Regions:
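A domain-start/cap signature at the N-terminus of enzymes
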Residues: 1-33, 46-53, 58-65, 90, ...
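Active-site glycine-rich loops that stabilize anionic/oxyanionic intermediates
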Residues: 31, 39-43, 243
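Structural cue for short, hydrophobic secondary-structure segments
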Residues: 36-39, 68, 239
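Serine-hydrolase catalytic-loop signature spanning alpha/beta hydrolases and amidase-signature enzymes
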Residues: 41-46, 74
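Cap/lid segment of the alpha/beta-hydrolase catalytic domain
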Residues: 70-93
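Alpha/beta-hydrolase active-site loop
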Residues: 86-108, 128
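Short beta-strand/loop motif that positions the catalytic acidic residue
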Residues: 169-171, 175
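Acidic catalytic loop of the alpha/beta-hydrolase fold
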Residues: 175-178, 245-247
Length: 276
């Protein structure tokens, strides 16, 4: 292991907010920072295991500082109108939390570029950052999440606040919790997260906002189709056929999440897309 794991905390809104910082042994003078927001009921450490430590390995080989924030009561206050969680009840400001973490990281390390990945609820948090913290990110990656539909799309800022940002999306067509084709997201009717757009609709909306052209479609693996919208701010959608609510990381996960793929590892694609 050629990195140090730091457990950090800060005070915000009367809450002690915690986050993990993976600091590689070899750091450039202005290292990039990659925030990775966990899914519902997870934590930073759970996400590290969930991804088979592949993003810790990314930190090691690229000199990127990887940060795993912890949500309040294991959730982030994302951009959906429907979010029946404690973090929404308390009005937690996870945009401010992200800004404060980044300020502290800049003070300590002198940061170059800033990126964010998010899975499920964490992916929704990244979508919120794109609109409610425009220009904060140099790139975003969203796993198993799509824009809310209609009134379920509820960031604080209007969509017009968005600033063009390269975005990578990965979504399984057999996702049981965040339907690839859109519809009602959530475990069941009692735990719904409201109506959401499809993955292709979400990618197309981001591409339009980015002024990117396409898509050009390519089958990159037997079970993976990549669609690319190109321009100064590109968008890629990786459609994972028959795959569930997962982050491809070469490991076996809870069968209730659906099938995983062994065709590729997400961390490798993120590294290439962000140019880490």
């Amino acid at each position: 292991m050629t990195y140090t794991l730091h457990r950090r905390s800060l005070e915000l809104q009367g809450q002690t907010r915690k986050y993990l910082v993976v600091e590689p042994e070899s750091l450039p003078s202005r290292p990039d920072v990659l925030f990775f927001f966990h899914g519902s009921l997870q934590s930073g450490n759970v996400l590290r295991r969930f991804t088979n430590n592949t993003f810790d390995a990314l930190a090691e080989r690229t000199g990127t500082i990887v940060v795993y924030p912890n949500g309040v009561d294991h959730h982030f206050n994302d951009c959906r109108g429907t979010l029946p969680t404690k973090t929404r009840e308390l009005g937690i400001d996870d945009v401010a939390f992200t800004r404060e973490m980044l300020t502290r990281l800049k003070d300590e390390y002198g940061v170059g570029r800033t990126f964010a990945c998010g899975y499920s609820n964490g992916g929704q948090m990244v979508l919120r950052l794109l609109i409610d913290a425009p220009g904060l990110l140099n790139g975003a990656c969203i796993f198993a999440s799509t824009f809310g539909a209609g009134s379920n799309h509820a960031p604080s800022n209007p969509d017009s606040a968005y600033e063009p940002t390269p975005v990578l999306l990965m979504h399984g067509t057999a996702d049981p919790l965040a339907p690839y084709e859109g519809g009602v997201a959530g475990v069941d009717a009692s735990q719904t997260r409201g109506e959401v757009l499809s993955a292709p609709e979400t990618a197309a909306r981001l591409a339009k906002w980015n002024g990117a052209e396409g898509p050009v479609e390519e089958r990159v693996y037997a079970d993976i189709v990549k669609q690319c919208w190109t321009g100064d701010f590109s968008v890629e959608l990786w459609t994972m056929e028959g795959i569930g609510h997962v982050i491809p990381s070469g490991n076996e996960l809870d069968a209730r999440l659906g099938k995983n793929t062994t065709s590729f590892q997400a961390a490798d694609v993120v590294e290439r897309f962000f140019g880490l």
